[in-house]
């Protein structure tokens, strides 16, 4: 049997890491957004240099490939393909700042298509940390480089539509190679 003091301490720790939230006069509840605590932890790890940009990219690459595997298993609807094409069209004419936002929208849409709440909860904070690096990468690009990035993103959609794992793998090598070069890793 636990003492009340031990239970309070455990709840305090869970609240501190964002898993539990306390509502005055109502009690303690499991947080609806545990991903935010993971995101804060990743940012702290970066600030304390206990992780690196390269490690974030490595984890993101593995997770992104898993996202694509799940999407290939379920397939893309014509409407989803059209949505991605609209994002790609926006990327073509976008400024550097707008391009980074379109990239965020593109990758978030991929993540949401997994239809897996736990996967999204785990991936979103890593994606946020990764996407904070994108403006730095885009900042080093010219119009031709951004056009090449649009083509790389189009390759992924083509791979997903065709259920072609090799195309998707080629996308990941090109995309993350571009990111690593932009961050000079």
Per-region residue spans from a language model:
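C-terminal all-alpha effector/ligand-binding and dimerization domain
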Residues: 86-88, 92, 128-185
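Hydrophobic packing residues in well-ordered alpha-helices of helical domains and bundles
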Residues: 56, 60, 80-84, 99, ...
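Short linear motifs at protein or domain termini
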Residues: 1-59, 63
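Hydrophobic, amphipathic alpha-helical faces that serve as interaction scaffolds
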Residues: 47, 59-76, 104-142
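Exposed, interaction-prone assembly regions rather than primary DNA-binding/catalytic cores
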Residues: 68-103
């Amino acid at each position: 049997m636990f003492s009340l003091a031990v239970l309070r301490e455990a709840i305090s720790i869970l609240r501190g890491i964002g898993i539990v939230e306390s509502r005055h006069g109502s009690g303690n509840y499991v947080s609806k957004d545990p991903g935010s605590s993971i995101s804060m932890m990743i940012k702290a790890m970066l600030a304390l240099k206990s992780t690196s940009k390269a490690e974030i990219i490595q984890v993101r690459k593995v997770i992104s490939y898993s996202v694509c595997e799940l999407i290939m298993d379920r397939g893309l609807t014509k409407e989803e393909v059209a949505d991605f094409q609209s994002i790609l069209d926006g990327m073509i004419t976008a400024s550097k700042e707008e391009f980074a936002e379109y990239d965020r929208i593109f990758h978030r849409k991929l993540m949401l298509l997994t239809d897996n709440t736990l996967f999204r909860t785990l991936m979103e904070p890593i994606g946020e940390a990764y996407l904070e690096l994108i403006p730095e990468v885009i900042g080093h690009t010219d119009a031709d480089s951004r056009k090449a990035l649009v083509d790389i993103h189009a390759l992924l959609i083509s791979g997903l539509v065709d259920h072609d794992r090799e195309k998707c793998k080629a996308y990941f090598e090109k995309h993350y190679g571009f990111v690593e070069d932009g961050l000079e890793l």
